[in-house]
């Protein structure tokens, strides 16, 4: 498992934008590599939408985005199409299909206590290929994208001026807003049986919950 300050491991990966070699593909740029537990899951979908809607802000800081899960590339492509169809949001960044989990294990993205899916990890890598920040979130908690933007800016500022940034530095500069697709609703875990799927669909018809699909339902807290 890698540690903070270490060089990002050299690896060739299959992505939705074709094969690429990391970290060389992004040499001269910063990049944010983030893993998600699985395609066609609700929390991950909200994250991808928010990463996409903030993509230009990352680009303005000479920073690229790249996603990862242990799904196959065909699943990634279909999920990206679903997101475009449902929310009219293009996913402009590549997504790694680490279907054997090799890179995920190198980066400590798979917890032996949390199943075989990747956790919600974030790695910020500088233009020389060094890992500058590592964040891990549990599967049930979505990430705050403005905080990741703030962290990138803080690291770049530290490098440029030889300074350090204090707690809550520039939180006022970034708009901490609810999810653009579910607001402050909470997400109901995806159905794990046909009976549960049918129940969700019935509850949605009654207006008890809202669903974009049978696996993506949300509601207000009572």
Curated annotation (Swiss-Prot):
GO terms for biological process: cell redox homeostasis; cellular response to stress; hydrogen peroxide catabolic process; response to oxidative stress. It comes from the Archaea. Substrate binds at residue 120. Its EC number is 1.11.1.24. Belongs to the peroxiredoxin family. Prx6 subfamily. It is found in: Cytoplasm. The active site is a conserved redox-active cysteine residue, the peroxidatic cysteine (C(P)), which makes the nucleophilic attack on the peroxide substrate. The peroxide oxidizes the C(P)-SH to cysteine sulfenic acid (C(P)-SOH), which then reacts with another cysteine residue, the resolving cysteine (C(R)), to form a disulfide bridge. The disulfide is subsequently reduced by an appropriate electron donor to complete the catalytic cycle. Thiol-specific peroxidase that catalyzes the reduction of hydrogen peroxide and organic hydroperoxides to water and alcohols, respectively. Plays a role in cell protection against oxidative stress by detoxifying peroxides. This is Peroxiredoxin. NCBIfam families: PRK13189.1. Gene3D superfamilies: Antioxidant, Horf6, Chain A, domain2, Glutaredoxin. Residues 2-157 form the Thioredoxin domain. Its main location: cytoplasm. Keywords: Antioxidant, Cytoplasm, Disulfide bond, Oxidoreductase, Peroxidase, Redox-active center. It comes from Nanoarchaeum equitans (strain Kin4-M). The active site is at residue 44. CDD domains: PRX_1cys. Disulfide bonds join 211-217. It catalyses: a hydroperoxide + [thioredoxin]-dithiol = an alcohol + [thioredoxin]-disulfide + H2O. One of its GO terms (cellular component) is cytosol. One of its GO terms (molecular function) is thioredoxin peroxidase activity. Homodecamer. Pentamer of dimers that assemble into a ring structure. InterPro entries: AhpC/TSA, Peroxiredoxin, Peroxiredoxin_AhpC-typ, Peroxiredoxin_C, Peroxiredoxin_TDXH, PRX_1cys, Thioredoxin-like_sf, Thioredoxin_domain.
């Amino acid at each position: 498992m890698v540690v903070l300050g270490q060089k990002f491991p050299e690896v060739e990966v299959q992505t939705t934008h074709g094969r690429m070699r990391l970290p060389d593909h992004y040499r001269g740029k910063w990049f944010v590599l983030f893993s998600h537990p699985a395609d066609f899951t609700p929390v991950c979908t909200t994250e991808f939408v928010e990463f996409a809607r903030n993509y230009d802000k990352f680009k303005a800081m000479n920073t690229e985005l790249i996603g990862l899960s242990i799904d196959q590339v065909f699943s990634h492509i279909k999920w990206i199409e679903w997101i475009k169809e449902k929310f009219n949001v293009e996913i402009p960044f590549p997504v790694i299909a680490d279907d054997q989990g090799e890179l995920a294990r190198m980066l400590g993205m798979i917890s032996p206590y949390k199943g075989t899916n990747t956790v919600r990890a974030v790695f910020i890598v500088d233009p020389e290929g060094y890992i500058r920040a590592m964040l891990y979130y549990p599967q049930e908690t979505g990430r705050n994208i403005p905080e990741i933007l703030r962290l990138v800016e803080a690291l770049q500022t530290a490098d440029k001026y030889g300074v350090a940034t204090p707690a809550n530095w520039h939180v006022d500069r970034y708009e901490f807003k609810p999810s653009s697709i579910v607001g402050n609703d909470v997400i109901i875990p995806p159905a794990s049986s046909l009976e549960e799927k049918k129940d969700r669909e019935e509850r949605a018809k009654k207006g008890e919950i809202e669903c974009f699909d049978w696996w993506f339902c949300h509601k207000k807290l009572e």
